[in-house]
């Protein structure tokens, strides 16, 4: 996909930020649930249509290389709302809790005079750290329905409320989290679907992939409804809109992993009059950078209270780069037995360290009694008609790739987005491996991350009860 990067000269076209009380922008964050970034047409996805997302991107800046530290809902949202990496904020597992006293976007923007609200999925704890004003309208649908109920009147009221206070509003949708129950999957010709390279081509996989794609199209419709509500509120011209797809989908190799299609996310930012329309950037950013960016855009100094750093200069077109590395981790408890992972990404390479490679990876929602998807067993079937032999062999290969992993993995991000070719044994890349491994170890040490011992039932339960391991004292 061609990349149109910001020219540095664009900075000359953008006025410097010097905000008075009535010039502070509003912020509207639109977030999906378990949408793999490159299933979206904006990132090359070939199967669906998303006119509202594409329209938003045509009016703003698309980040080609945005990431989140953990490919699970609770940890990535805690990172997003705190500007801190998982070990320092405390949410180092799914269904866990931030450290007692952790400050969030509610505190940081609230102190700057913002009303801070959330409509839809919250999934962050403790409540004392995330005291969003609750805004009605977005509900979770567990029964099949082509079009979900979605009343935007309270969302519009929150954005258009009279007064001098600017707003920050999260609209957090449940699409496309499994089980995939909304939308119209029957519209897809299963035989013509282009399956991603990391999915086994079985009939059940194709059928469930269609139900997942249908939910993404519903999310796009919901995005359009939210943007219509913003227009109706009269606040569109002074509102920064951020759209992100969260972690990857609940298919093997995406969510619950440190592979590219798990930890990489869509990110689009629209800021009328401040961002050139239809631009793209290869700047490396991650969720920990978002809150410092909002604080800076609101006219305050982000300082050193965050792990992340403001990418406001990227938005302004003043630089094409942001950070040298993004930092990633995974603790498998409570989604399965321990399988700790740490990894690091730079402009080209992705290095993964599996801390217990002797273990068998298992995730209960895809592979066990809690599963809501029914394709996994078809990946394990090695027998069948001769015409299916090659498909079956590939399915078993992909299942083994998912369950059994080496101690180290190294991938060329641009050449291998589905990360099917592990280059760790390439002697010509030994210097790359050593550089990334050293940087990863330095990051873990700076956070106070003990590594494999963190991925345990006891550690997870202690964290949920507010008894975390102590972090290091500063970023």
PLM segments and residue spans:
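Hydrophobic helical h-region of N-terminal Sec-dependent signal peptides
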Residues: 8-14
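C-terminal helical cap and adjacent loop that interface with cofactors, partners, or active-site loops
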Residues: 414
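Bacterial N-terminal signal peptides that target proteins for export
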Residues: 1-8
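Formylglycine-dependent sulfatase
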Residues: 12, 19-409, 417-442, 451-452, ...
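Post-cleavage N-terminal segment of exported redox proteins
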Residues: 7, 18-19
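A glycine-rich phosphate-binding loop feature that marks nucleotide/adenosyl-phosphate handling sites
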Residues: 456-460
């Amino acid at each position: 996909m061609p990349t149109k990067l910001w020219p540095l000269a664009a900075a000359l076209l953008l006025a410097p930020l010097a905000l008075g009380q009535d010039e502070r922008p509003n912020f509207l964050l639109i977030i999906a649930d378990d949408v793999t970034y490159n299933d979206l047409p904006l990132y090359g996805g070939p199967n669906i249509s998303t006119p509202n997302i594409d329209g938003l991107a045509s009016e703003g800046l698309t980040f080609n290389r945005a990431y989140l530290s953990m490919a699970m809902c609770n940890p990535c949202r805690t990172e997003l709302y705190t500007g801190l990496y998982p070990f320092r904020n405390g949410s180092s597992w799914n269904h866990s809790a931030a450290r007692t006293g952790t400050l969030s976007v509610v505190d940081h923007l609230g102190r700057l005079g913002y009303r801070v609200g959330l409509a839809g999925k919250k999934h962050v704890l403790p409540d004392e750290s995330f005291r969003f004003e609750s805004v009605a309208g977005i509900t979770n649908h567990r029964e099949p329905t082509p079009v979900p109920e979605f009343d935007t009147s309270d969302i519009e009221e929150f954005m258009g409320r009279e007064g001098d206070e600017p707003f920050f509003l999260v609209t957090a949708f449940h699409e496309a989290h499994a089980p995939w129950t909304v939308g119209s999957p029957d519209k897809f010709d299963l035989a013509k679907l282009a399956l991603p390279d990391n999915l086994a081509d079985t009939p059940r996989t194709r059928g469930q992939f269609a139900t997942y794609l249908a939910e993404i199209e519903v999310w796009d419709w919901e995005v359009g409804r939210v943007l219509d509500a913003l227009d109706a509120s009269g606040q569109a011209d002074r509102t920064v809109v951020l759209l992100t797809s969260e972690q990857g989908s609940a298919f093997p190799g995406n969510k619950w992993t440190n592979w590219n299609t798990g930890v990489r996310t869509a990110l689009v930012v629209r800021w009328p009059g401040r961002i050139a329309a239809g631009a793209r950037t290869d700047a490396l950013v991650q969720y920990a950078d978002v809150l410092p960016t909002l604080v800076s855009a609101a006219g305050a100094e982000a300082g050193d209270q965050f792990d992340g750093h403001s990418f406001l200069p990227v938005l302004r077109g003043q630089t094409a780069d942001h950070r040298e590395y993004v930092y990633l981790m995974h603790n498998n408890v409570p989604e399965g037995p321990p399988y700790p992972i740490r990894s690091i990404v730079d402009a080209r390479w992705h290095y993964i360290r599996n801390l217990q490679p002797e273990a068998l990876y298992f995730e209960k929602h895809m592979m066990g009694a809690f599963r809501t998807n029914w394709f996994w067993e078809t990946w394990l079937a090695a027998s069948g008609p001769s015409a299916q032999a090659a498909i079956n062999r590939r399915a078993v290969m992909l299942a083994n790739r998912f369950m059994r992993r080496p101690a180290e993995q190294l991938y060329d991000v641009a050449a291998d987005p589905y990360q099917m070719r592990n280059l760790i044994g390439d002697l010509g890349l030994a210097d790359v491996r050593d550089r990334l491994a050293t940087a990863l170890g330095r990051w873990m040490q700076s956070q106070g991350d003990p590594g494999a011992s963190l991925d345990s039932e006891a550690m997870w339960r202690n964290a949920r009860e507010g008894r975390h391991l102590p972090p290091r004292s500063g970023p």
